[in-house]
UniProtKB/Swiss-Prot annotation:
The gene is ispG. PANTHER family: 4-HYDROXY-3-METHYLBUT-2-EN-1-YL DIPHOSPHATE SYNTHASE (PTHR30454), 4-HYDROXY-3-METHYLBUT-2-EN-1-YL DIPHOSPHATE SYNTHASE (FERREDOXIN), CHLOROPLASTIC (PTHR30454:SF0). This is 4-hydroxy-3-methylbut-2-en-1-yl diphosphate synthase (flavodoxin). [4Fe-4S] cluster binds at residues 270, 273, 305, 312. Signal peptide: none annotated.
């Protein structure tokens, strides 16, 4: 029931990765990357499908060899989500996956080789309407830039990115997006800020090598949150040393927290104290797991007592306020019922699913009326 965030998005050029629009006000796309051996087709397909189930808009796959390129062909045939092929050094791999229907090429023109090889890749991408992502990383800056700046700096990342941008400009190719990633939050944020002022291309956000699930999520939330709150960013990846599925979940949580893009349940829950009248923590944990399949945007407040419960419930789609033996249930800010504290999880799950059905039907009818 909260209003969308008053964030003014940076104006950027529209490109498409498969059927997913990127830039020019399109919803910010959330993506991840497989960590299986690409030559293990079954494992890679299974992981991509798992990412699809939790809402991944785009999935990146590393293609380091020709054998991996042949595997990519089989993988592409078995999944629906757009795939980005991560290519380094061998331009022939880029040409091969383009032949096999890749939706986007992630390259650095600087490590593909000669001008002729870069032109071959760009010409192929143009002919097949395949966009390119220029991926600059603080950990792999060009040697001359390392010597010039002494260490990765925002100016160094910007200069590296602009070299590659200029290269594509000279080849009259404008279907690309750019990233300037670093593991240091401030370095990444300032690099993106500088780049956003220089070009109109879509920007892919990320804090690279952020760390494990907990620390990496925190770093990404801070770094990406700063940029997104300033209107910078058209697609993002939360890079975690964890199951890639978690990257998608955290990515959507960041967007939900900023009210930029809603997907699924946004739980508002108190940290609990001695006033709680039911097991808030157990209830929230159980419902997060049970309701992972729901994609209907909805705010659900679960508060253990009457201090803050009624106030949160007023601005939630559904809200529970802890009470003695039974807790108050609010719907769209109005108290509707009381739930038995001993059966809270099952009852609340049923109410949330029922509300999701109602909201989905209302959305369907609204779309039909607009299309008439």
């Amino acid at each position: 029931m909260h209003n969308q965030a008053p964030i003014q998005r940076r104006k950027s050029k529209r490109i498409y990765v498969g059927n997913v629009p990127i830039g020019d006000g399109a919803p910010i796309a959330v993506q991840s990357m497989t960590n299986t051996r690409t030559t293990d087709v079954a494992a890679t397909v299974n992981q991509i499908k798992a990412l699809e189930r939790v809402g991944a808009d785009i999935v990146r796959v590393s293609v380091p060899t020709m054998d991996a390129a042949e595997a990519f062909k089989l993988i592409k045939q078995q999944v629906n989500v757009p795939l980005v092929a991560d290519i380094h050094f061998d331009y022939r791999i880029a040409l091969k996956v383009a032949e096999y229907g890749v939706d986007c090429l992630r390259i650095n023109p600087g490590n593909i080789g000669s001008e002729e090889r870069i032109r071959a890749v760009v010409d192929c991408a143009r002919d097949k309407n395949i966009p390119i992502r220029i991926g600059v990383n603080a950990g792999s800056l060009e040697k001359d830039l390392q010597e010039k700046y002494g260490e990765p700096t925002p100016q160094a990342l910007l200069e590296s990115a602009m070299r590659h941008v200029d290269h594509l400009d000279r080849l009259n190719f404008d279907q690309f997006k750019v990233s300037v990633k670093a593991s240091d939050v401030f370095l990444a944020v300032e690099s993106y800020r500088l780049l956003a002022k220089q070009i109109e291309q879509p920007l892919h956000l990320g804090i690279t090598e952020a760390g494990g699930l907990r620390s990496g999520s925190v770093k990404s939330a801070i770094g990406l949150g700063l940029l997104l709150s300033e209107g910078i960013g058209d697609t993002l990846r939360v890079s975690l040393a964890a199951d890639p599925v978690e990257e998608i979940k955290v990515g959507f949580d960041i967007l939900k927290s900023l009210r930029i893009r809603a997907r699924g349940i946004n739980f508002i829950a108190c940290p609990t104290c001695s006033r709680q009248e039911f097991d808030v923590i157990g209830t929230v944990n159980a419902l997060e797991q049970r309701l992972e399949d729901l994609i209907t945007p909805m705010d659900v407040s679960i508060i253990g007592c009457v201090v803050n419960g009624p106030g949160e419930a007023l601005v939630s789609t559904l809200g529970v306020t802890g009470g003695n033996k039974k807790s108050g249930l609010y719907e769209d800010g109005i108290r509707k019922d009381r739930l038995d504290n001993n059966d809270m999880i099952d009852q609340l799950e049923a109410r949330i699913r029922a509300k999701a059905t109602i909201l989905d039907e209302a959305q369907r009818i609204s779309i039909q009326q607009i299309e008439k």
